[in-house]
Amino acid sequence: SEPTAYLTVNPLPERVLAARRDGVAALLLERGLPASGVDAMPWLLAGAKTLSYAVNMAALRHAAGKGAGDVIFVSSDGHILEGPRSTVVIATEGDRGRVCLLTPPPWYPILRGTTQQALFDVARDKGYDCDYRALRPADLFAAQGVWLVSSITLAARVHTIDGRRLMPPALAAEMAELVDTAILSDR
């Protein structure tokens, strides 16, 4: 039979527009999984995109109740994983003094971020170092910038984590441009 496709089109929610414009406050919440060793637990479907968003939506409701707009999940062994609907990307100083964009390794129990992958492709072309690295909460606080990257919100700058204000990143506008370019080039 012929393939069937469905398409729905809706305006962006105000939450998305505000996150793009103003950034977000986020809470660090434990995900209940180790960063490594998930191969021993294949029944958990870690990193699989499914229609079961119960944990993610509950985490976002919990964050909203605490005055935060988003969540960054941390593994049970203390590593940064992902957001409920985003990939975590940080900016830090690289080995040669250039800005380096980092994100958690794709072999962690996370969903690979297509927006993050496109961002890294564009950023490398513009001279940024980009890499996958094990990150801990302290790395977020020490970073030159923290973003939650996704195909809908694009790049939401994280300005507060667990009530602690982060330094405004010098490259906030540049990051927004990189993500916009990545989205347009990843067609």
Which functions belong to the PLM regions below?
Residues 1-187:
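Helix-start/capping segments and mature chain N-termini
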